[in-house]
């Protein structure tokens, strides 16, 4: 039976291991319907920064704050690894390719938001990602039933957009009501069934 998880968080369980992309991933689901799902991994920073993007796209950044220039890009997933998108809070600005999500969030994949960032015009929260993750019609439902993912609707923008990436997965696990010990115990028992 289909269940819509749009605007919810997927947390990789300990059953996903030895996977360079999805082990301990935190994924914000941007879209989920009967045709499939699309989400962004939000806790896997890359070595590239917004400075690299501005230089590659020849966006003027001479007056850009250093904290913006040094902002890391995140690997959103394995699909379209060169597509740059910004997950952000809505800020009243109209960009040419914004898709509004729930909880005051949006995703934009156009040059105008990058130009705003280079000009220090910032949404309250934002996260630049390259690539995305997607699932076919029943694939995500099957993976959830197989206990690959914990789904939580307990969205905290503060946790979602913070840069403590090494503990972001753990912070989301705890925000969802689990401890690492209870999670390990639960999945050891599942593995023994």
Curated annotation (Swiss-Prot):
Please indicate which superkingdom the organism of origin belongs to: Bacteria
Q: Name one GO cellular component term.
A: cytosol
The protein's matches in InterPro entries, at most eight in alphabetical order, are given as:
AlgH-like
Q: Which family does it belong to?
A: Belongs to the UPF0301 (AlgH) family.
Database matches in HAMAP family:
UPF0301
Q: Identify the PANTHER family for this entry.
A: UNCHARACTERIZED PROTEIN YQGE, UPF0301 PROTEIN YQGE
Name-wise, this protein is UPF0301 protein Fphi_1754
Species this chain originates from: Francisella philomiragia subsp. philomiragia (strain ATCC 25017 / CCUG 19701 / FSC 153 / O#319-036)
């Amino acid at each position: 039976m289909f269940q819509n998880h749009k605007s919810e968080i997927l947390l990789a369980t300990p059953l996903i291991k030895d996977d360079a992309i999805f082990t301990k991933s935190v994924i914000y689901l941007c879209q989920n319907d009967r045709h499939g799902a699309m989400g962004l991994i939000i806790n896997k920073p890359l070595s590239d920064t917004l400075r690299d993007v501005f230089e590659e796209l020849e966006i003027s950044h001479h007056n850009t704050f250093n904290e913006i220039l040094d902002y890391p890009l995140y690997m959103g997933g394995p699909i379209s690894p060169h597509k740059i998108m910004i997950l952000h809070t809505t800020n009243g600005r109209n960009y040419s390719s914004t898709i509004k999500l729930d909880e005051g969030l949006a995703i934009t994949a156009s040059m105008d938001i990058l130009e705003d960032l280079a000009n220090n015009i910032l949404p309250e929260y934002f996260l630049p990602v390259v690539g995305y993750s997607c699932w076919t019609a029943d694939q995500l439902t099957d993976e959830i039933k197989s206990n690959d993912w914990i789904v939580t609707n307990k969205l905290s923008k503060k946790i979602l957009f913070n840069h403590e990436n090494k503990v972001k997965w753990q912070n989301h696990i705890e925000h969802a009501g689990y401890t690492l010990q209870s999670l390990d115990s639960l999945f050891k028992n599942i593995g023994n069934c």
